[in-house]
Structure formats: C-alpha cells, structure tokens
Design a protein with these regions (language model features):
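Phosphate-binding/switch loop-helix module in NTP-utilizing enzymes
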Residues: 125-173
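Single conserved hydrophobic/aromatic residue that forms the stacking wall/gate
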Residues: 1-7, 11
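Hydrophobic positions on the alpha1 helix immediately C-terminal to the Walker A/P-loop
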Residues: 64, 68
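Conserved nucleotide-sensing/catalytic segment adjacent to the nucleotide-binding pocket
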Residues: 81, 88-141
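Walker A (P-loop) phosphate-binding loop of P-loop NTPases
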Residues: 58
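Conserved lysine of the Walker
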Residues: 61
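Conserved NTP phosphate-binding and transfer environment spanning the P-loop NTPase/kinase superfamily
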Residues: 170-301
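N-terminal pre-Walker A segment at the start of P-loop NTPase domains
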Residues: 18-39
Length: 301
C-alpha cells in the first residue's frame, strides 16, 4: 500500500510539474519495481551508492530519477538525492576560451569537454563524507541564461544520502574509436566542422575525467530510444514544455524555435548514434522507450 500511495501522489503532481505523457502504468511498471530493486539490492552502508541514468536528450532520465528518488525518500525511507550533468557545465568564459583555442563549436554547451567534471566529483566527495548535519550545496544551471545560478541560490542537501542519482545523456559512454572516424554526418558538421577538429576534441575529452566519474557508478540504467529522429522530436517537446513553464519575459525570448532545437541536437548526433548501438551492452538495466513514449524493461541484471 505504501508504494502505490506514493505512486498515486506522484501521479497527482505530474500536472503541477507539466510533465507530458506520464501514465500510472509508468509508475506501476517502471518506477515502483526499480525503486524496490534498488532498495533490496543495495543495503545500507557508510558510502552512498552512485547510480547513473543515461539516454538521449528528452528520453525521460530526469523524470525517472525524480520519481524514483521520491519513492525511496518517502516510502522506502532511504535518503536519495540527484543532480544532472546539465548542472555542471563549464562557464561561458571557459567555453569562450576553448572556442578561441580549439574550435568555435567548443562554446556550445552539451558535448563532452563542456562540463566541469571536477565540480561533479567534488560534489560526490562532499556528499560521501557528509555528517547527518552537513549542508551540501547542489550546483544549479540556468539554461536559458546559459550560466550557473548564483551559489547562494543553489539547493541545499542536508545529511548523507544512501543514493546519489546522476542523469547524463552520455553517462557511461566510452570514446569512439578514431581509426574508423566517419566523415561529417549532418549539416552542422558539414558546415562548421568539416575536418572533424571539434568532434575529435570532444571525443578525446570523453576519454579523460568523464571516465574517472563513470568508473564510480554502482549501477548504470539506460533509457534506449528507437533512433535519432526520436531524440530530435523529444528535445523539441522538452523545449515546448519549458516555454509553458517559464514566466520571465526575457527568458521566454530565449526559448529555441524548432529549427534551433534541431540544429542544437546535431551537436550530439555522432556520440548519440554510438551510444544507442554500444551502451546497452555496458548498462545494468535497459528501458526501451517506443515512439509513443511507452517504456518497457528490456534488460535487467
């Protein structure tokens, strides 16, 4: 009864969160079993467990992470918290200098090389060494303004969690083999990176601190979407949802058009294609998501 009441409470909140295409079936067949699995598989210990949710843009990683945290915190009474790779971007200044030094596309946030992985590692370290009274600031990034919120506005987590959830579109990914490097594969690469300088730089960055962070995962859960077209469409739905939730007029003006969203997703296409092919083998749990936004569990440990 506890789990189902938590699930129905979560279901009532979906309207308030403006999350589309969420069903009670998703909560009963996906959220609840995974929450119970985590509780039963990972007994209490001194160090938090580090769980990664990976999958393309708009696949539902953050939503799934949020609801599992809610069930663990409120029903199973296992403290859980989460953060996103989208909250640990490098600053505009850092990306600007990369753009001057390496390639103009390095300024655009999102691909490996544009995140401050050390910030993420420091956060994990702080939470792992926290006492019950420790207050840890969780980084928060404002996408429409392309900057971190001032640190005094960052959310605070009190105590030491049993679980740290991390959602990242490229979580767990290995670098692409460079010997079979494909020529430019979309309009963005053809026009702005015909020599592959930027895409190879990002791939090399993925082989550095990212692998250090990914090696800490106690469990990797992947949401596998059907294809790249789905990623484009999902990311556009996400932007429309953002447009409904943003009240500030200046921020509303920074919401992307459909063309801008598609151009933006082109930055991720090379690595996303590789992830869709290779990452299911490396993941502990794989959720398949079809074109109608329905989830099913396709791989379990």
């Amino acid at each position: 009864p506890g789990i189902s009441s938590a699930a129905s409470d979560v279901y009532k909140r979906q309207e308030q969160m403006k999350i589309q295409n969420l069903s009670e079936e998703f909560l009963a067949e996906i959220v609840t079993p995974i929450s119970l699995y985590l509780d039963q598989t990972f007994p209490k210990r001194n160090q938090p467990y580090f769980i990664c949710f990976t999958g393309g843009q708009g696949s539902g990683k953050t939503t799934l992470s949020f609801f599992i945290q809610k069930v663990l915190n409120e029903t199973v009474k296992r403290p859980a918290m989460g953060f996103s790779i989208d909250d640990i971007y490098k600053s505009q200044e850092e990306r600007r200098s990369l753009a001057k030094e390496i390639h103009p596309l390095c300024y655009v946030r999102g691909v490996p090389g544009t995140h401050d992985i050390k910030m993420g590692l420091n956060l994990i370290n702080e939470l792992s060494n926290a006492s019950p009274e420790t207050k840890t600031k969780i980084p928060a990034f404002c996408k429409p303004e392309d900057r971190h919120y001032p640190s005094e506005e960052w959310p605070i987590y009190k105590g030491k969690p049993d679980f740290i959830f991390f959602d990242a579109w490229c979580g767990g990914a290995k670098p692409l083999p460079e010997e079979n490097w494909l020529p430019p594969l979309n309009q963005l690469e053809k026009e702005e990176d015909p020599e592959g300088i930027w895409s190879k730089w990002s791939n090399q960055e993925l082989s550095k601190d990212y692998q250090t962070m990914f090696s800490l995962f106690d469990l990797l859960l992947m949401i596998k979407v059907p294809n790249m077209d789905f990623v484009y469409e999902s990311r556009w739905i996400q932007e429309q949802t953002l447009a409904k939730t943003v009240k500030d007029k200046d921020l509303k003006n920074k919401i992307m058009t459909k063309e801008e969203v598609y151009r933006f997703v082109m930055h991720y296409e090379r690595l996303t294609n590789y992830i869709l092919k290779e990452l299911p083998k490396l993941s502990d749990i794989v959720l398949a998501r079809d074109g109608n936004f329905k989830f099913s569990i396709s791989k379990t440990p």
